[in-house]
Amino acid sequence: MENRNLETLAQELGLKKQQVETVLELTAEGNTIPFIARYRKEKTGNLDETQIKAIIDMDKSLTALQDRKETVLAKIEAQGKLTDQLKAAIEAAEKLADVEELYLPYKEKRRTKATIAREAGLFPLARLILQNSPNLKAEAEKLTSEAFPTADKALAGAVDILVEAFSEDNSLRSWTYNEIWNNSDITSTLKDQSLDEKETFKIYYDFEDKVSKLQGYRTLALNRGEKLGVIKVAFKHNLEKMHRFYSARFKQKNDYIEEVINQSLKKKIIPAMERRIRSELTEAAEDGAIQLFSQNLRSLLLVSPLKGKMVLGFDPAFRTGAKLAVVDQTGKLITTQVIYPVAPASQAKIAQAKKDLADLIKKHAIEIIAIGNGTASRESEAFVAEVLKDFPETSYVIVNESGASVYSASELARHEFPDLTVEKRSAISIARRLQDPLAELVKIDPKSIGVGQYQHDVSQKKLSENLDFVVDTVVNQVGVNVNTASSTLLSHVSGLNKTISENIVAYREENGEITSRAEIKKVPRLGAKAFEQAAGFLRIPNAKNILDNTGVHPESYPAVKALFKQLAITDLDDSAKAKLKALNLKETAEGLGLGQETLKDIIADLLKPGRDLRDDFEAPVLRQDVLELKDLSVGQKLEGTVRNVVDFGAFVDIGVHEDGLIHISEMSKSFVNHPSQVVSVGDLVTVWVSKVDLEHEKLNLSLVNPRESN
């Protein structure tokens, strides 16, 4: 059946109708987004994962909108009130909120004051008010009842009828919505400063901005400050202009009509439109925050791994001591230890801690020490730097330990290290994050990784869905070693679920290393479809068939075999690679029955078998000396690593305890629309110190050389 959303999807997303249709068909056949993006490029016109997801998500939204329209139309028609004009308006509505606005007058309501007044026969009196009848009191006397015993109460009931009708008028509500959106201001004032000891919301104690210009991060800050009771948020309208517009709907005026206007405007329509606009502002702000978190997470997962290094994980603490964990080049735990390197430990204990750390470095030839950035991190860094004066071959890195404690207390960590304390597991996690960030970070709920803004204030369901998509995308783009990956990492591979991933690990434990992709088919519960979706993303480094350690899908093996025969290739040496580089893509693809995009990917994999996408990204900055905030001076040039990107700038680790802020205005000499256009999490950047605030321990940085800023 023809999908009724195709035209709209193609138009909204700037794609061809055929591309949209193909993606929806492939999805309906059970193909995953990573599989479609990597192995069906010719069919989709080379769409990437984000574009494919956008098609799928928007199709769901449009289908939900269309279903609601049909429900609303059927309900209004059942009442005998569906006009051609109303039907056309509902069918043309582009938002669910607009459909609900049009449906409002026909919606089944709970008993209201207007309902009671109508039941008491006061509708004729309401009509007389509109006609500005000269004898309203007398007419009202005739319509008194038990519910409305006096003329005044009857008139008040008639006003209620008019207020309800007037406040449900779609043209009035629509005009008011647009007026507030385009011309009103949103304000905040201080409500209770005692709830804001750190003055986090100081900027919002007396704040005002145009509704239409309010930035997403400000929306979320206003929401949080209001929720905490620190500030009061309100709108500022041109009520005089609104009143004039409403009054123009009445040919004649009287005190009762004036009451109808005031009640409709101030008690009904304005509050309803304010709620709608704040809801829309929040939704847009949440979407922006989620998108930014997703970008940051992707960058963090793609940080280049420090492969083949002996690493010591150092989880700092004051009273309970620092937990150390030595892991070998493969991430295997060698030993753990607890030392007391900082106060309140005695000088004797600190001296012993120095000896213990030095002994570990010597015994295990430690190349890098990974220090968690939590409690006691600054003091621990100074301690490590002091010890490393005797070990010029060893460096240290401050590692973002967000989520390490969450992982350490998880069932997964207990299963992996049942005999270790939570703190020692944290030290292992910190060390492994340096060796292979992706493999370690997938064990942690992405929301706990801490590279977003206001992530706890947004829709948790939507946030989880988007972050899971990012993790899945990165895992499949990088590829997974089927023989070393944890079941958690495997579960993110296209086509694999928790059960199949656990079965792969169990199969390895029982049968030893998997030696070919074909052998993967022997794993219980891994059927033909799962194999098709997963095989190309699973790597086997020591496989007999070199293709098993590439992104080449088994479905293309016969074509590659034919290509090797055609080029007389027996081994992927320099001569073979030269032949592959010299190929005419178009002619060769046609001869092999492959698409050009597929052949292009195959050649890229053959030129670099086992290549890791992350090797093209920045590695962490290695340090040996401690830098203090007091050592910095304005204009000083430094190197640093971007730790977080937010709407108003980016935070950079330059080796002092506090990350420095590069405000968006300091990112370029020209206008920057958003910080993510300039930097990403994990980037190595050259910065200049623009401000040092020792009292508040704050640091401001700039990407602009002060000598060139003018």
Describe these PLM feature segments.
Residues E100-L104, K113-A114, R118, R127-L130, ...:
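S1/OB-fold single-stranded RNA-binding interface
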Residues T32, T44, D48-P149, Q477-D616, ...:
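Accessory alpha-helical DNA-binding modules that contact the DNA backbone or grooves
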